[in-house]
Amino acid sequence: MKFSLLSAIAAAVFVPFTSATPLASTADLSYDTHYDDPSLPLSGVTCSDGDNGMITKGYNTAGEIPNYPHVGGAFTVETWNSPNCGKCYKVTYNAKTIFLTAIDHSNSGFNIAKKSMDVLTNGRAEELGRIKVTYEEVASSLCGLK
């Protein structure tokens, strides 16, 4: 009896932590208006060229990225030619969600176009400045990328 009870308790505690469903994480999010410029040359961002670069993927300006203006810097893009260049993130704030394409480095969390932060905050990006969001990496197709 003791063994069955202990096994049941262990299973109840362990099973939720082994779920295949990805868990969302939290991060800071801020904006930078230079990402709002559709003519922003991708030659000037961390994810410029190289095997993982956005130019190599066929995009020369921010406005050419399919889900523009939902672009910006991500803390996951640490250096030039990072394997995280072009990754798509589902970013949520107060039940509003955008799908963000990482094109640059951010020192802390995400740093995105003001237009995108306005979508998340109902036009309050400038007022709020920095917010806490939940995020998870998702399929690049959700950002319109192949």
Curated annotation (Swiss-Prot):
SUPFAM superfamilies: Barwin-like endoglucanases. Residues 1-20 form the signal peptide. One of its GO terms (cellular component) is extracellular region. Transmembrane segments: none annotated. It comes from the Eukaryota. It is found in: Secreted. Belongs to the cerato-platanin family. This is Heat-stable 19 kDa antigen.
